[in-house]
Amino acid sequence: MPGHNTSRNSSCDPIVTPHLISLYFIVLIGGLVGVISILFLLVKMNTRSVTTMAVINLVVVHSVFLLTVPFRLTYLIKKTWMFGLPFCKFVSAMLHIHMYLTFLFYVVILVTRYLIFFKCKDKVEFYRKLHAVAASAGMWTLVIVIVVPLVVSRYGIHEEYNEEHCFKFHKELAYTYVKIINYMIVIFVIAVAVILLVFQVFIIMLMVQKLRHSLLSHQEFWAQLKNLFFIGVILVCFLPYQFFRIYYLNVVTHSNACNSKVAFYNEIFLSVTAISCYDLLLFVFGGSHWFKQKIIGLWNCVLCR
C-alpha cells in the first residue's frame, strides 16, 4: 500500500519549472530589502497607532515566512525534500498562513484609514503603548499556540505521503469538510476584497470632487493613495489564486485522475501570493519625497490638459 501511494504521488507531481526558483529568489531578496527598509521608517512612526502596529505585524509575518523560503528553494533545486515530513507540512502551511495573515493586516490598515476618513479623525490609536503591545502579543499567541499547531497537526493526515516529496497534499481536498472550508475561505476573501475596493474607489472619488485643485496638499490624500498599494497587492497577488482555487477545487474533488497541469498552475498562483512581501518596499516608496513629486507633476499635467 505505501508503495502504491508513492508511485501515485510521483505521477501526480506538478510540472517542475525553473520559474518557481526564480520567483522565490526574487521574493526572498525583495522581502529582505523591504523588511530592512521599513525598520528605519518604523523608528519615526507612532507606535500607538493601529496602522503602525499592523505594519509592525506585517514585518513579523513576512520575516517568519522568509525564513522558510530557503527550504523551498533547496527542494526546488535538488528535487528532494531532506527535512522530514512534519517540517514539510509546516513550510507548506506557512505559505497559506502568510497569505491570510497578510490579508488580515491589510484589512486592519484599510478599515482603520476608512474610519479616519468617514469620522474625520486625525488618527486611530491605542490609549497606551502597552495596549498596542498586548493586542499584538495576544494575536500572535493565538496564532502560535492554536492556529499553527492545529494546521500542522491536521494538514495531510488522511493519506500516506512520500517524505522525499513535499507540497503535494492535494488529495486532502477530496474530503467534503476540507472542500467546504476551502470554498468558505475563498468566498470570504473575494467578498472582503471587493468591498474594500468599492470603498476605496468611493473615497478617492469623493476627495477628487471635493478637493480637486488642492488635492495634493492634503495629507489624507496621500494616506488614501497608499491604500491603493495594499488594494493592488490584494488584486494582483491574492485574488488570482482565490479565483483559480474555485476551479482547482472542482477539478481535484471531481476527478480521480491526476491533472499535472492544473496542479502546476495552482502552484504558480499560490507562489505569486508570496510576492506580497514587496508591500513593505511599496510602503516605504509611497512615503518618499521623490514619489510625491512625481505624482504632483503627473497631476499638474492632467489639470493642464
Swiss-Prot record:
Gene Ontology cellular-component terms listed: plasma membrane
Q: Which domain of life is it from?
A: Eukaryota
Name the Pfam families on file.
Answer: 7tm_1
List the subcellular locations: Cell membrane
The GO terms this record gives for MF are: G protein-coupled receptor activity; oxysterol binding
GO biological process terms, alphabetically, are: inflammatory response
Name of this chain's protein: Probable G-protein coupled receptor 141
As recorded in Swiss-Prot or TrEMBL, the protein's gene is named GPR141
